């Protein structure tokens, strides 16, 4: 900590107001769980991010990414090194039109819910199903978020990203190709999916979406329907990361139903609980630790596997220092 502080504190690149040391992360995640970041850095723009990535690589300082904090479980130890937030990449703009198509660029730091509200205000259709979705545009693209049978990739035209490669770190453009995408999978994920910025990591900076002109009132109604549906299903009743496990069509039933049929709704581990109202939500019920949540996830996996033969795949990313 002291060594990292002395390096970054005395480097003009990490100017005052863009970096915080030993930053508590609980308020920044939907789980309200996890240890601190040794350093949390918010670059002011894309060029600032590029300079920082080159500096961190040159000085062999580990780095990770955080988006909206809604699909991650931060370890109780938190993050070593520098955790980078792209919240300042928050611009939304129309960049072109073709017939009835409208091309909208949104920065990675834009909150998805803010983008859907912006689309309503500008009478643009195509994002209604993402109304009320927590998280950021960068995270939604990275995870290929899927809501009500529509994936974020279904609306993509192109993506600007940065390829992390030491002193060769550079900006690049990606044109949407459907063969690169799958159910909650994108060409920007590594295997295993991680928040860590490793060599050749592709970091989403902005995305261009293809939308269409529509009637503002109709778009607003459809968007609000999704918001209210999330509320009625208890998405926001307790701190959680939403769906804990991916669905798998080969299993014949949604993950939540498999968990419910295994008699696991309401099961507790420390302060963590399988939500009594939804089998696929694991919630922070009583000041749970990250270890409580992870242990409960593993218990659910084992029980469902023992009863059905199916191994549920977590959608939640285990982030930070789990050593």
Curated annotation (Swiss-Prot):
Q: Point out the signal peptide segment.
A: none
Q: Where is the FAD-binding PCMH-type domain?
A: 33-214
Protein name, entry field: UDP-N-acetylenolpyruvoylglucosamine reductase
Names of required cofactors:
FAD
Q: Does the keyword Oxidoreductase apply?
A: yes
Enumerate the transmembrane spans.
none
First-listed, main subcellular location of the protein, grouped into a coarse class: cytoplasm
User: What's its top-level EC category?
Assistant: oxidoreductase
Q: Which HAMAP family match?
A: MurB
Natural source organism: Treponema denticola (strain ATCC 35405 / DSM 14222 / CIP 103919 / JCM 8153 / KCTC 15104)
Keyword terms = Cell cycle, Cell division, Cell shape, Cell wall biogenesis/degradation, Cytoplasm, FAD, Flavoprotein, NADP, Oxidoreductase, Peptidoglycan synthesis
State the Gene Ontology terms under molecular function: FAD binding; UDP-N-acetylmuramate dehydrogenase activity
Q: What is its EC number?
A: 1.3.1.98
Pfam families, sorted: FAD_binding_4, MurB_C
What is catalyzed by this enzyme? UDP-N-acetyl-alpha-D-muramate + NADP(+) = UDP-N-acetyl-3-O-(1-carboxyvinyl)-alpha-D-glucosamine + NADPH + H(+)
Identify the coding gene: murB
Subcellular location(s): the record lists: Cytoplasm
Q: Which GO terms describe its cellular component?
A: cytosol
